[in-house]
Each structure stands twice: as C-alpha cells, then as structure tokens.
Amino acid sequence: ALELGVVPTFAAKWLVPRLGDFQRLHPDIAVHLSSRTRPFLFADTALDAAIFAGDAGWPGTASCFLMDERLVAVGSPALVKTRRTLKAADLAHLPLLQMSTRPYAWRQWFESLGLHIDNDLAGARMELFSITTEAAIHGQGLALIPRFLIEEDLKQGRLVPLIEHEFVSDRRYYFIYPEQKSDNTVLALFRSWLDAQATRYREAQP
C-alpha cells in the first residue's frame, strides 16, 4: 500500500478521477489518501509521500514537478449574465471571494494586468478551493481557481470565465517523498505513473 497525503481539492478534482488507471495497472497496490493542507514533517506521520502546492525544497526530501497553478477568474452565469463585455477593471465592482492560503491572489492577478484596485483584498475568505468553487457556483462572488480544478464546472456551464487571462501563481504542485524512500518499489511505480499523467495533462493544455 501507499500512504499519500494530498491537498483535498486536488485529490477530489484531479487525482481521484485518474486513479482508476493506476489501480487497473497495479491492482495489488492500494493507495490511501489523507487530506493535508499545510507543510509537515514526514517523520511525524505514517505517510510515504505527498502532493503539495508550494515550495519543493522540504529538508530531506526528493520531489517531482507536476504542474503550475494557473488561476482563472470565474463566476456563476447568474452573477455575470448582465455584464457580457466585462473588462478586468470591472471585476473590482463585483464581490471577490478570497483564499486564506493565498491572501494576495486577487492583487497579484490584477497587477499582472497592470491594474491597481483599492478593494482587491476585501471579500469573504475561505481556506479550500473546493469551498471557494461552491461559493462561486452559487453566485456569492467571483473566484480565482486553478483551471485544472474546475474543468468540469466550466464544461457544464456552472462557472464561466470572466476574461481570457490566466495568472500563473508562485505556487507549483509537486509530488514529494523522503529521500530514503527513493528506492521503494511501490512509491517508484506510483511516482512514474503520476509523472506520466501530469506530463500528459500539461502537454494537452493550450
């Protein structure tokens, strides 16, 4: 078995839908998922590896890059239906949903467009992308969400992109594991599979 710590929304929206492929290839390996939203020490847990958004430089670990975090500004169709010609500056007049783990995300997004908005830090603050996504779907505000977490919501029309602009945040997603487990057969099989899945996903992006 493999004990894997993973940020919950990534697990639910990206990893779990693909995990059946790994189970088909390796039916004798069970992958146990535990929710982790903050950095931790492997020595304090029973985890073999983790998928984390942030810095890969954890002491005593090795890592495999998975993908960048490309944030898209989205909202519910009902919230934006009367504003069909939105420009980036117009978004400041709509409620902005904030992420407690990325408190300056909207400011960085606006600045990437050369804009400085007075109320860019205001708005309801939430910890997880899953919660923020649901709040946006229910019309409670605009959200900045990584595209790979909301592809189905965009496809089904539950969320709509507000303008054609993706902001690459300073966070990247990595597969991280203790260096002493580098030769672990189960971990190596999962790492190889995950790397292939992430590479396929990245190459399919426009």
Features from the language model and the residues they span:
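Short loop or secondary-structure boundary microenvironments that flank
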Residues: P8, S100, Y177-Q180
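Short amphipathic alpha-helical coupling segments at ligand-binding clamshell hinges
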Residues: W14, P146, S182-A196, R202-A204
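C-terminal regulatory
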Residues: F40-A46, A56-D170, Q197-P206
